[in-house]
């Protein structure tokens, strides 16, 4: 996990539905892991 993810996750959680935020988290995790 990078600082970029830590910054984006709250934004997605507030700006989008939780289910969408989970999908984004999975994509970001795959990209870095």
Curated annotation (Swiss-Prot):
Keywords: Thioether bond, Toxin. There is a cross-link at residues 12-16 (2'-cysteinyl-6'-hydroxytryptophan sulfoxide (Trp-Cys)). The keyword Protein biosynthesis does not apply. Processed by the macrocyclase-peptidase enzyme POPB to yield a toxic cyclic decapeptide. POPB first removes 10 residues from the N-terminus. Conformational trapping of the remaining peptide forces the enzyme to release this intermediate rather than proceed to macrocyclization. The enzyme rebinds the remaining peptide in a different conformation and catalyzes macrocyclization of the N-terminal 8 residues. Pfam families: Amanitin. There is a cross-link at residues 11-18 (Cyclopeptide (Ile-Pro)). GO terms for molecular function: toxin activity. Transmembrane segments: none annotated. The keyword Protein biosynthesis does not apply. Residues 1-10, 19-33 form a propeptide. Toxin belonging to the bicyclic octapeptides amatoxins that acts by binding non-competitively to RNA polymerase II and greatly slowing the elongation of transcripts from target promoters. The typical symptoms of amatoxin poisoning are gastro-intestinal distress beginning 6-12 hours after ingestion, a remission phase lasting 12-24 hours, and progressive loss of liver function culminating in death within 3-5 days. One of the few effective treatments is liver transplantation. Belongs to the MSDIN fungal toxin family. This is Beta-amanitin proprotein. It comes from Amanita pallidorosea.
């Amino acid at each position: 996990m990078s600082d970029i993810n830590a910054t984006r996750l709250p934004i997605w959680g507030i700006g989008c539905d939780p289910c969408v935020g989970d999908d984004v988290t999975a994509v970001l995790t795959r990209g870095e892991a």
